[in-house]
Amino acid sequence: MKLQRFWLAILVRGAACACALLPWLCCIAQDPATYHQQAGRALQSFLLKFWKGNAQYLRNAYPSDGTLTGYWTYAHGWEAVMDGVERTGGQQYSGLIESFYAGQNASGWTSGYYDDECWMTVALTRAYDLTGDTKYLNQATALYADITTGWDTTCCGPSRGGLWWDKAHTQKATAANAGAALAGARLYQRTGNSAYLNFAQQVYSYWSANMVDPTTFQICDHMNTSGTKVWWRFTYNEGLMIGASVELYEATGSPSYLAAANNIAGYMIGHEVTPTSYGPVLYDGSNTGCGGDCHEFKGPAYRYLMRLYAKDTTKTQYYTVLKASADALWSLALNATSIVFSVNWAGPIQSSVDQAQDNAACIALNRFAQQYGPYPGSGIPRNQYEAENATLHNVSLEAIYGTFTGWGYIAAWNADGQSVDFNVNCTTTGPHTLAFRYAAGAGNASRVIAVNGVNAFPNRGFSSTGAWDAYSTNTVSCNLATGPNTVSVIYNSALGSANYLNLDNLVVGGDAPEVIRITSISLPSPGTLRLAWNTIKGRSYQVQFRNAAGTGAWINVVPPIIATGPAASADDTVGASAQRYYRIVEP
């Protein structure tokens, strides 16, 4: 299903050159595809090693120690996956958003720690942004209601206020207070409910007044019940307050929040880095000195320093740390044999790692690649749906046998309750073909094939391929609707499902090319042009321009946009008078 491209020329005022927006594209002779490849390999290795299908959760360690990761590190692992979805414009990993949601839904949404709930709230709002599914936002608001109960004015010290870190009321920590400000500001921007903003500002104001050094701008880690402030130094604390400041700046437009974020970032890059041959790298301690929760800390710190840098790309001192950290991760902290990363981003490498340190590395590599340059594409045809990017229910990921497509396949499923959902987006209603690429090395297998919740093929046989590294195709015909459809492959012993089956991909045939029509062109503010066009939910689109003569390379206006409904829009900020030709293409 190839995309029909639409382009037009528009005279706009005020074209800002790309170099001013993204200086590293102009001064660094590095192919963006290299960074995207590194980010992809890191995230794919992370998923292959840590996703535990029969638990619908993440393992704690590699090699596995038999335990599962914790609540808050699962939230960051989920965010790392969504970084991959965003970076690739929805071409990869999209179905896994729901897989991770299902895993936490089965485990329960509340925690004994308010800071952990803040991170899960942020992850839920991110899932809503990428999918448009309000169930994620509804769960975020329900969870935030629990967070607000942690506010207390009876303890601690001379100026009493702030959120408890935990429900046992042992301390008040930056993790909970900056986290609540950050999450509340995000909820306000998505719901318009001023109660979220008011609470976020209340928490932020208290913490800024009482727990930030007014001279150095270091953030205090926590305050115990006696009122004693504990000034542990971690990138995490500064990163969270940077994130809260940026979110509140976006929610209110007040420059004071941006100024605070820059002050705090100055402390971070001045005191929480270590020198390497690539430049200063974010640092919370050595592989042995940074233990426990510390393994996760640099991930969110990097995320929010990057968010701040995106607000003002003249802050090259931030970019120096961001790029050096990404380069050192790949060159100094990567175990090239197993594709895992050490706690210390400056190395040395480690053989045994945990999920937290690995997802922190994935966060940094994916955020940097997205900011550095455009995604070159997955190379996967639009009508080919990779099983490893689908929504998984109690099935495992694997990348061992034969010439599989994409970055893996699903495996180890032969029990009731196991299934995979492909989210298929069509341009036409009517007959389509579904071709499943699979391996059945243990003999003949069978599965239920359901379409939009109806068992279209209750006991479809998959003939033996004779070996796990030999693949075959099983094709059926069915009717699909215009827009999103769900094609499920299910193990149900009552309907005759049997034996093991590795599922590689689904190719959908019989669809027509998509015709994109620009539906409106507007100027929402001086110097900003907005294009709107029709979409199919779940597909991704790339808006590009080139110069007035209609020659030269096409330049991406924004990263690929994942449609969350029947229409989408993109803004192009311009400076001096210029004529531009625009088009919307398949990324």
Protein language model features and the residues they cover:
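Low-complexity, Pro/Thr/Ser/Gly/Ala-rich linker/spacer regions in secreted
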Residues: 28-31, 369-385, 507-525
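CBM-like carbohydrate-recognition segments
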Residues: 31-80, 84-115, 119, 127-128, ...
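Extended ligand-binding groove/face enriched in aromatic
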Residues: 94-190, 197-201
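Active-site cradle of extracellular carbohydrate-active enzymes
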Residues: 180, 184-188, 195-248
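Extracytoplasmic
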Residues: 377-512
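Short, composition-biased motifs enriched in small/polar/acidic residues
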Residues: 512-587
